[in-house]
């Protein structure tokens, strides 16, 4: 087993990972939507991405796919600036908030109906579900408006005091998929649960460890992975919670670090108290460098994947296949594979177009690997395919990612001290198992939106139902973290 440290731009890759847990996360992460009260649910469930027949079209007044992505990424840069200001006692600029308002106005103009936004490429019109992007901005604007109102009334107050006076629960409760009453019950239970987690420092003398999945756990699912962007309120709360109450906090996701990946999509400081990983913990961003665990990966496999990634960028920018950049997983360059979205949850890409796209992918694979000795085309689910580099048979899961992080940091999961693992699918169970193996009585787990079978598995692995907590959506956790921080601030 080897570990390499490289600059951000350099990448490695790895093995054929036929892992049911990983598949579980990929299937659920495709375009699953968290539906909230007050929205047109039927429209969202029946629409995701509608791709028209290729033809030369009139693009007047219709936003292009590239324009949409550029709008969202520039808006996310502004979110990061706002988060930085709030965390470092800087003034918020009116311009920054206005940028978010203008982005929201753009997303809700007459090109959008019931969260379906009409867009185009050079030859194709399409309709994209932007419900998650819109709601995230809506919640942020309410949150920032509350902060700014208090700041105007009492300009000498520090941001933590101002934040403690904002009722985040009331802002988020209306968006809970099961209503306010359920939100309140889950919120109260989660506040108590998190208090148990952070109180362990007083008993053991060590701050606890917090490790979490991302999509579906700390961030609502989005129809487009490429624009699954973290809101301000979430970024501020997670960063402050990690800094105040934990000695290690980490996000461990199946997606990549870059390209886009978690480092592009988060609004948290990437070199702050929360660390980030991609590819099931095969790649980490630590101390400003990309750390890659390349077990079983050959140089030939890495090079072939890198060349295919370049081929895919060319394919999406110079053909009728541009819409596939926004189909589910889009194009994700992971350590050992490329994950490619080929269909939406609601099957709004025609079979003919999806098949043509997959044939185009195979043709690009042949350019890179003409003898089919390095790359494997794996139609892993009906929603996505994977192009995987041949490997030495090593099976990697998120538990391995946790193990490598702790080893890299020179720390331990063993007692004394508590560990909180958060997830939402079977692919997150290996993180729980890894922690329980090292610290049987010190592991707590929060799982989001889990089916009964998954809940039972979590309880069985933990071995103590009182150390398990289940909620319906990520916002419950964010509201609970906010309350813990508010009480901590008032206590000071």
Swiss-Prot record:
Its cofactor is Mg(2+). The active site is at residue 215. Mg(2+) binds at residues 213, 215, 424. Changing residue 334 to A: Strongly reduces catalytic activity. It catalyses: alpha,alpha-trehalose 6-phosphate + H2O = alpha,alpha-trehalose + phosphate. This is Trehalose-phosphatase. InterPro entries: HAD-like_sf, HAD_sf, T6PP_C, T6PP_helical. The lineage of its organism: Eukaryota, Metazoa, Ecdysozoa, Nematoda, Chromadorea. It comes from Brugia malayi (Filarial nematode worm).
């Amino acid at each position: 087993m080897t570990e390499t440290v490289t600059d951000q731009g350099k990448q490695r890759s790895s093995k054929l990972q036929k892992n049911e847990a990983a598949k579980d996360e990929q299937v659920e992460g495709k375009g699953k939507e968290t539906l909230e009260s007050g929205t047109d649910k039927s429209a969202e469930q029946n629409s995701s991405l509608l791709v028209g027949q290729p033809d030369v079209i009139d693009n007047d007044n219709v936003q292009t796919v590239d324009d949409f992505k550029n709008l969202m990424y520039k808006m996310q840069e502004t979110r990061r600036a706002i988060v930085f200001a709030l965390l470092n006692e800087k003034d918020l600029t009116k311009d920054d908030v206005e940028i978010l308002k203008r982005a929201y106005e753009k997303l809700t103009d007459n090109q959008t109906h019931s969260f379906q936004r009409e867009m185009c490429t050079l030859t194709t019109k399409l309709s994209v579900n932007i419900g998650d992007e819109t709601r995230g901005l809506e919640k942020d604007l309410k949150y920032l408006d509350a902060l700014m109102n208090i700041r105007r009334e009492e300009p000498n107050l520090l941001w933590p005091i101002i934040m403690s006076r904002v009722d985040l629960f009331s802002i988020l409760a209306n968006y809970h998929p099961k209503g306010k009453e359920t939100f309140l019950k889950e919120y109260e239970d989660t506040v108590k649960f998190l208090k148990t987690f952070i109180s362990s420092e007083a008993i053991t003398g060590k701050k606890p460890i917090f490790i979490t999945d991302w999509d579906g756990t700390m961030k609502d699912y989005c129809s487009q992975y490429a624009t699954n962007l973290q809101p301000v309120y979430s970024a501020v709360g997670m960063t402050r919670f990690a800094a105040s109450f934990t000695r290690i906090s980490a996000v461990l996701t199946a997606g990549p670090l870059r390209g886009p990946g978690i480092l592009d999509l988060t609004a948290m400081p990437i070199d702050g108290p929360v660390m980030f990983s991609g590819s099931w913990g095969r790649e980490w961003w630590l101390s400003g460098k990309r750390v890659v665990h390349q077990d079983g990966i050959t140089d030939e496999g890495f090079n072939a994947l890198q060349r295919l990634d370049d081929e895919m960028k060319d394919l999406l920018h110079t053909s009728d296949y541009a819409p596939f950049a926004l189909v589910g997983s889009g194009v994700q360059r992971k350590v050992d594979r490329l994950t490619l979205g080929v269909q939406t949850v609601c099957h709004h890409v025609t079979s003919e177009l999806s098949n043509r796209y997959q044939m185009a992918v195979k043709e690009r694979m042949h350019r890179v690997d003409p003898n089919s000795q390095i790359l494997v085309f794996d139609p892993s689910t009906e929603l996505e395919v994977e192009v995987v580099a041949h490997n030495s048979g090593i099976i990697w899961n998120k538990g391995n990612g946790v193990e490598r992080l702790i080893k890299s940091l020179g720390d331990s999961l063993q007692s004394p001290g508590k560990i909180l693992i958060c997830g939402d699918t079977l692919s997150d169970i290996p993180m729980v198992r890894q922690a329980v193996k090292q610290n049987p009585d010190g592991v707590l787990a929060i799982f989001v939106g889990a089916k009964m079978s998954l809940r039972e598995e979590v309880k069985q692995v933990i071995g103590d139902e009182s150390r398990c907590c289940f909620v319906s959506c990520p916002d419950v956790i964010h509201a609970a973290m906010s309350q813990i921080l508010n009480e901590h601030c008032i206590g000071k």
